[in-house]
Amino acid sequence: MTTSPYTSQSAFDGSRMRVTLLVDPSRRRQQEFLDAYEQMRDRVASVPDLGDQLCQSLENPSQWLITSEWAAPPYLAWVNSEDHLETVKPLQSCVRDLRSMRYGIVRETGGTGPHLGGLQTAVRVGDGVTRHALTFTVKPGSESKVAEVLAGYAPPQADVDDSTRLRRTTLFMHGNRVVRTVEVEGDLMAALRHVARQPEVRAVEEAMNPHLEQHRDLTDPESARAFFARAAMPAVHHVARGGPEPAGLRRHALYYPARPGCGMALARLLSRQDETAAADPAGPVTAATVFQREEIVVRLIDVPGDPETDPVMALGIHGKRKAAVLARLLDGAALGLAGPPTSEREATRLLTHADMTLITDRRAAQP
């Protein structure tokens, strides 16, 4: 029997976050990089509560990093925005590599300046896995063809290098929206680049191009970078109860389109509900991950059997008035619904409308 530890990761614990962007300028283009950074500074200065520092390596002056300190929710809102894409655009033509690292601040010594939040109240327990998602839409009417293309490709090689491994890839659709989730042990960006280079994956991506609502040209680095930046949907919360894995465990994705401006609040609500549910050993949801980008919220749940046996817990609306709170944040019309689910029957109906169609779920063999 497979067992797993209790794990919990969240962007909603109120702690401050240190963001470090490692920059490798193209050879002999350092001055262009500095000029591009000067352009960025003006835009960064216009973002409330944001400042950054440009640092140059003492050992290797060609290596740079840009650091900034945030509260996690406003950072996630900004990094997923069109304004962020425009802000970093000047860097794209003069750097070979950009790598972003994000850390919650756990301990602090000294310092008396104002802060945007507190410290992490407890050290998080992780499982060595990074979770990420991509989402995009295809042209209406092409859904069946897209599902066929996505279901038919050969899985890429799981091992990226000695320290990075692609553990699981799952694809879902809801109407004309595609969601691809990945679990990676090690370096997420290295794994994504590894997957993108695989011939079978490139063939699928090319076959998808005519069906996409947003145009992209994968032979143009800037076009490809912009597409995947807009498609990125980071995990804002993950919790797993741990212990022996129940028999018949299945993964579902639930789609929660939020009302304008309510995406972060909806993701926060679901995250808190999942933390509560994880403390109940008899609950049906053994693990849950919330992904959010603007008004798009997707929640992965692992449940044994049929989630309709307990639709309230499966949807994350257990507890007093939680269904009403969800209804205020959810764009019910986008799911073909009106009003909060006030009965188990209505909760089952919401679950049916929110449940995404599984296209493929591939796990790498255990090493």
Swiss-Prot record:
One of its GO terms (biological process) is antibiotic biosynthetic process. Residues 15-106 form the ABM domain. Pathway: Antibiotic biosynthesis; curamycin biosynthesis. The keyword Ribonucleoprotein does not apply. Keywords: Antibiotic biosynthesis. It comes from the Bacteria. It holds the Pfam family SchA_CurD. Belongs to the SchA/CurD family. This is Polyketide synthase CurD. The gene is curD.
